[in-house]
């Protein structure tokens, strides 16, 4: 009855091999192959304004079976616009972590350590500053070869860059365990974001289980066992979070579909009977009926009632 595609902003214009063997834009293929059966809408959204806590611009395509097109448009199923949230509002209350610390009350509030010689590269950075811009060459990312400093190549401006507290969180990449990856440095502390912080940024519920232990069981483990488990599982968890679909965005779409399916959707004959029974030709009765929606009707049915009553008054 419905389908949803999510991909990069240029998804619909990207070339692909069509069923006939030719190269066509993905969007053209979708409309050709599915357009006969589905009403299709495509929108480019920055998820930061649609329920995610990080900035990520994506294409979302929603299709609705034409059998239901009289009652719902795919546009109605998109998540609602919301104001973006700052990183501080999302993770600002998380406890600070010492070097290599695993939070005693939250196993997932921990970060992957890195060689301590690299710490001076980011230690003095203010929000928005990059380690490659440090004046001291020893504080710029480098390696030592035959006793000589060899600077690392700066391929991206957002590597080794301290994030802003009062801006929306950045897009989360798969190698979010590394300082050398994009937008990974905590706004205040000399570390990457913890798994728990990443979960909050990506709207993954706190109760989600990454391993077959409850949080209480994980918190009760001896420190040695905690470190061993993190060593085994942390990279897989982080890579699953990076580039993931923000759960809250698609929860809203699913909720909109669920609400639609639970509503009544009337034919024209039933709508005319409803107008008669509720005396909806009276404007005041119509307004109250739409506001209260006593029959739990879908938007299309309510709009049709308003349309028919207005035409009858004319």
Can you describe what each PLM-predicted range is?
Residues 1-159:
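Class I S-adenosyl-L-methionine
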Residues 109-314:
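C-terminal target-recognition/interaction regions appended to catalytic cores
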